[in-house]
Amino acid sequence: MAAPSGGWNGVGASLWAALLLGAVALRPAEAVSEPTTVAFDVRPGGVVHSFSHNVGPGDKYTCMFTYASQGGTNEQWQMSLGTSEDHQHFTCTIWRPQGKSYLYFTQFKAEVRGAEIEYAMAYSKAAFERESDVPLKTEEFEVTKTAVAHRPGAFKAELSKLVIVAKASRTEL
């Protein structure tokens, strides 16, 4: 949308700015549908646990979080999944809403089914109140077409958040 040409006084320019902002605010959302968020417990004890959830038409996409951790007591974590309006992209975010986890993770892996990863990031600390996300060093984790996982020997046992953006897998005829 371009501004009409011609002379503008302060009132006309303000009116045009208000109309432009209104048009932007009222346009249909194009990004992600309303996400589904599910809570789950991350349990210490060194045993491998998994949690998964599906999203999309016909539960087209799956996000699975597999981990083993040591330390204190259970922590409540969340998994949020959403799809683009055309259902060609999906997001999976796994995180501890209280920010930093106090558990020591001996391993982790977040996998997607029905899609291929376009972007993934792992964080040692999740944003909470006035603090920002703190990403893991790239040498601590690896990303494949379908998973983000710890790198044995390089991962420093701190994990508080994982973010994945994936695109629908192409189906060949």
From Swiss-Prot:
InterPro entries in UniProt: MYDGF (IPR018887)
Organism from which the protein derives: Homo sapiens (Human)
Family: Belongs to the MYDGF family.
Gene Ontology BP, a term: positive regulation of transcription by RNA polymerase II
Record keywords, A-Z: Angiogenesis, Apoptosis, Endoplasmic reticulum, Golgi apparatus, Secreted, Signal
Tissues showing expression: Expressed in eosinophils (at protein level). Expressed in bone marrow cells. Expressed in synovial tissue. Found in synovial fluid of patients with arthropaties.
Name of this protein: Myeloid-derived growth factor
Induction: Up-regulated in response to myocardial infarction (MI).
Pfam families (UniProt xref): UPF0556 (PF10572)
Cell compartments where the protein resides: Secreted; Endoplasmic reticulum-Golgi intermediate compartment; Endoplasmic reticulum; Golgi apparatus
Leader peptide range in chain numbering: 1-31
Domain of life per record: Eukaryota
